[in-house]
């Protein structure tokens, strides 16, 4: 049964869509500041307000 095996092993012509998180521009505005790393981790919330 070549037909059955062929369907199982189909050439992947469709582009593989990698699930990437949407760019958080509004939610993570502080991420653009100097303390982007700490702000993104929600460790220093004051950093966002100061800068």
Curated annotation (Swiss-Prot):
Record membrane topology: Lipid-anchor
Key words of the record: Cell membrane, Lipoprotein, Membrane
Subcellular location, record wording: Cell membrane
Cellular compartments per GO CC: cell periphery; plasma membrane; vacuolar membrane
PTM annotation, UniProt: Palmitoylated near the C-terminus.
Disulfide bonds: none
Residue ranges the record marks as coiled coil: none
Source organism superkingdom: Eukaryota
Short name of one Pfam family: CYSTM
Matches recorded under InterPro entries: CYSTM_dom (IPR028144)
Renumbered residue ranges of the record's region Disordered: 1-28
Keyword Membrane applies: yes
Keyword Membrane: yes
Other remarks in the entry: Present with 861 molecules/cell in log phase SD medium.
Entry similarity comment: Belongs to the CYSTM1 family.
Record protein name field: Lipid-anchored plasma membrane protein CPP3
Upper classification of the organism: Eukaryota, Fungi, Dikarya, Ascomycota, Saccharomycotina
Gene designation per UniProt: CPP3
């Amino acid at each position: 049964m070549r037909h059955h095996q062929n369907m199982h092993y189909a050439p992947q012509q469709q582009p593989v869509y990698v699930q990437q998180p949407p760019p958080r521009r509004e939610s993570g505005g502080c991420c653009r500041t100097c303390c982007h790393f700490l702000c993104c981790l929600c460790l220093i919330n004051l950093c966002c307000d100061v800068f």
